């Protein structure tokens, strides 16, 4: 192998730093080509000698594989080691086809299997150590943590060289490495599982019972592959060779790689992720709902439907249709947490279709470094949110009490659909229910007061919105989040949650429909959290004394401390509301039997605040728990 002196090279640009101990430069040979290589441009990894491990050059010199950058030579001076390698002109793309994703997984698994056959452990497998060249070929890089296993065993024995040092990236590190500080070939298998999980839109940091949570949208065949990697006991974990025979990739490895794959697992969604570095951000075929920002038109008066810390909702037009446009504020457009939550909401709502869930229309996902225009486009709801309606249109509810049942039925139907899709809302509040209604005056012939407005149930429709904090049922086991005043005790205490937590929040909505107050006007978030979560205090707001008995029963059952005592699901709540409707509102003439000012709050200390003219309002910043991202959900 030819040696090279650093004086023979001129720096073109910085490619980046692998860590604080090394950096990589793009360089050109000053005089001609590298002998026998026919190239004049290389990647030079410069490593501080204090942190250099001879393993890296020994391994790179030993292996020759299409999916590993070619090693040319290395040099050194008093302070640094210079490793000269093949320069990879990476392919910058952000969306991949399903078949491309499977091909990448196959390439990565085959590469790792090759290394293990030669007794090499990589020990730092993660998305940032994978790049694609300009032809889309996967390359595994950064062998700074790698070692050669001298024991020549079956892969289960521990490598002596790694016995007393943690090496790798914690998020992708196998349990036995974290606990025992020791690596095996099976440790690479765990890291592979975490990497594949992230490629298909999961988050290895979200863990339950020691194992990263696999999102519901991942296909069964992909789930099986990942699960074979993510087994806590390394003795039960698959070998790389075994993974090569898995039906997900077996027909794409070796001679079959260029043949049409007989198994084409269908992903249920397009997967979105901002966790990867720019050189390897996963990209999939552009979904039908993705649009360009210039396709949107905004109202001339720049109507604002709601303004929050991280985003703003504006009224606009898409294809000459009135829409609500929720934009991430430019100051937060590059915030990873904000963008992740945005992508998460798009992923969920783009697959929900129900009359009582705000209709998602499109989204703009702008990755241009010069300008960030992330936005969600949905139907425009002219009636504002339920919190505003309760506060500003109290008289309508008093004159038309049957509308309470209609609104609550709409919410329950939307939530039932959501739960049956495996989605837990986790932030069901009056701010996250939007209304459409027409103030069409229907004069009551029996009424002498022509100012009274009477509505048919068909005149109003309620829809659930803001799924930014939502999660699938497998992910929600120990995740906390939402508006504290509506949060169930088990959520506040960090206990496992499920759809019963949404039912608890629904109980507070029913209470709010009669008290005309918001839970957050009574106590501060900290006080409310302490009082609700405390088993002895077990605080709930006071139910007005003249609320009809059936409604009282529904409220107390929904917000029962024990989730098992709450309604089994929203279908049971719907049945109860239908029964209430028949008992109290058999016809419009009976509507007045429990109407008028008789139904008022008995809590004199509660002050009702006017939410203003905004159609999409936000709640207090401090009432949101968990990610710190939402005021009322995403806003």
From Swiss-Prot:
C-terminal tyrosine kinase domain is capable of autophosphorylation, in vitro. GO terms for biological process: cAMP-mediated signaling; regulation of cell fate specification; regulation of gene expression; signal transduction; sorocarp morphogenesis; sporulation resulting in formation of a cellular spore. Its EC number is 2.7.12.1. The keyword Mitochondrion does not apply. It comes from the Eukaryota. GO terms for molecular function: ATP binding; protein kinase activity; protein serine kinase activity; protein serine/threonine kinase activity; protein serine/threonine/tyrosine kinase activity; protein tyrosine kinase activity. InterPro entries: Kinase-like_dom_sf (IPR011009), Prot_kinase_dom (IPR000719), Ser-Thr/Tyr_kinase_cat_dom (IPR001245), Ser/Thr_kinase_AS (IPR008271), Ser/Thr_Kinases-Pseudokinases (IPR051681), Tyr_kinase_AS (IPR008266). ZakA and zak2 are coexpressed in prestalk cell population, zakA is enriched in pstB populations and zak1 in pstA populations. ZakA and zak2 are coexpressed in prespore cells, zakA expression levels are 10 fold higher than zak2. The keyword Kinase applies. PROSITE patterns: PROTEIN_KINASE_DOM, PROTEIN_KINASE_ST, PROTEIN_KINASE_TYR. ATP binds at residues 15-23, 45, 305-313, 326. Keywords: ATP-binding, Developmental protein, Kinase, Nucleotide-binding, Phosphoprotein, Repeat, Serine/threonine-protein kinase, Transferase, Tyrosine-protein kinase. The active site is at 124 (proton acceptor), 427 (proton acceptor). It catalyses: L-seryl-[protein] + ATP = O-phospho-L-seryl-[protein] + ADP + H(+); L-threonyl-[protein] + ATP = O-phospho-L-threonyl-[protein] + ADP + H(+); L-tyrosyl-[protein] + ATP = O-phospho-L-tyrosyl-[protein] + ADP + H(+). Residues 9-249, 299-585 form the Protein kinase domain. Positive regulator of gsk3/gskA activity required for cell pattern formation and a downstream effector of carC. The kinases, gsk3/gskA, zakA and zak2, form part of a signaling pathway that responds to extracellular cyclic AMP. The pathway has a role in transcriptional regulation; required to direct prespore/spore fates during development. Zak2 negatively regulates prestalk differentiation by regulating expression of ecmA. 'Zaphod' is a fictional ex-president of the galaxy with 2 heads. In the N-terminal section; belongs to the protein kinase superfamily. Ser/Thr protein kinase family. In the C-terminal section; belongs to the protein kinase superfamily. TKL Tyr protein kinase family. This is Dual specificity protein kinase zak2. It comes from Dictyostelium discoideum.
């Amino acid at each position: 192998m030819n040696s090279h002196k650093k004086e023979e090279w001129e720096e073109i640009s910085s490619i980046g730093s692998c860590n604080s101990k090394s950096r990589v430069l793009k360089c050109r040979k000053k005089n001609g080509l590298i002998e026998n290589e026919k190239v004049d441009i290389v990647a030079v990894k410069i490593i501080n000698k204090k942190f250099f491990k001879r393993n890296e050059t020994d391994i790179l010199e030993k292996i020759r594989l299409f999916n590993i950058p070619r090693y040319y030579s290395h040099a050194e001076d008093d302070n640094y080691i210079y490793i000269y390698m093949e320069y990879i002109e990476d392919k910058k793309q952000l969306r991949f086809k399903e078949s491309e994703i499977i091909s990448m997984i196959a390439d990565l698994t085959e590469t790792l299997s090759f290394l293990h056959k030669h007794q090499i452990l990589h020990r730092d497998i993660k998305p940032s150590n994978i790049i694609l060249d300009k032809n889309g070929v996967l390359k595994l890089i950064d062998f700074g943590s790698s070692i050669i296993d001298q024991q020549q065993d079956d892969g289960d024995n521990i490598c002596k060289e790694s016995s007393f040092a943690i090496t790798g990236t914690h998020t992708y590190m196998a349990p036995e490495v974290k606990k025992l500080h020791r690596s095996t070939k099976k440790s690479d298998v765990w890291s592979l599982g975490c990497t594949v999980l992230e490629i298909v839109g999961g988050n290895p940091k979200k863990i339950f019972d020691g194992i990263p949570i696999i999102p519901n949208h991942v296909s069964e065949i992909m789930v099986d592959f990942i699960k074979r990697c993510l087994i806590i006991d390394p003795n039960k974990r698959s070998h790389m060779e075994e993974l090569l025979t898995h039906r997900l990739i077996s027909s794409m490895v070796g001679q079959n790689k260029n043949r049409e794959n007989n198994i084409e697992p269908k992903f249920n969604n397009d997967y979105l992720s901002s966790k990867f570095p720019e050189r390897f951000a996963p990209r999939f075929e552009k979904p039908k709902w993705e649009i360009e920002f210039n396709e949107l038109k905004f109202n001339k008066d720049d109507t604002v439907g709601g303004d929050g810390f991280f985003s703003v909702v504006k009224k606009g037009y898409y294809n000459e249709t009135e829409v609500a446009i929720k934009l991430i504020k430019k100051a937060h457009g590059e915030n990873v947490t904000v963008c992740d939550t945005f992508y998460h909401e798009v992923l969920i709502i783009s697959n929900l279709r129900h009359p009582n869930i705000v209709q998602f229309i499109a989204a703009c996902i702008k990755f241009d470094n010069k300008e960030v225009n992330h936005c969600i486009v949905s139907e425009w709801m002219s009636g504002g949110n339920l919190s505003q309606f309760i506060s500003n249109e109290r008289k309508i509810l008093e004159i038309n009490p049957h509308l309470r049942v209609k609104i609550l039925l709409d919410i329950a139907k939307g939530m039932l659909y959501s739960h049956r899709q495996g989605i837990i809302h986790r932030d069901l509040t009056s701010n996250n229910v939007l209304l459409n209604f027409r103030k069409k005056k229907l004069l009551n012939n029996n009424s002498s007061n022509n100012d009274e407005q009477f509505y048919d149930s068909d005149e109003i429709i309620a829809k659930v919105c803001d799924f930014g904090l939502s999660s699938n049922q497998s992910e929600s086991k120990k995740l906390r989040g939402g508006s504290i005043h509506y949060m169930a005790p088990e959520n506040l205490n960090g206990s496992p949650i499920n759809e019963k937590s949404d039912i608890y929040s629904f109980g507070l909505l029913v209470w709010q429909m009669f008290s005309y107050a918001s839970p957050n006007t009574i106590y501060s978030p900290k006080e409310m959290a302490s009082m609700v979560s405390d088993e002895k205090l077990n605080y709930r707001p006071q139910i007005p004394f003249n609320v009809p008995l059936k409604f009282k029963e529904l409220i107390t059952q929904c917000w029962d401390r024990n989730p098992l005592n709450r309604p089994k699901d929203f279908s049971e709540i719907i049945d109860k509301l239908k029964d209430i409707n028949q008992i109290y509102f058999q016809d419009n003439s009976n509507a007045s039997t429990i109407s008028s000012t008789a139904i008022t709050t008995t809590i004199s200390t509660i002050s009702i605040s006017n939410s203003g003219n905004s159609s999409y309002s936000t709640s207090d910043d401090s009432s949101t728990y968990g990610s710190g991202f939402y005021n009322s959900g995403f806003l």
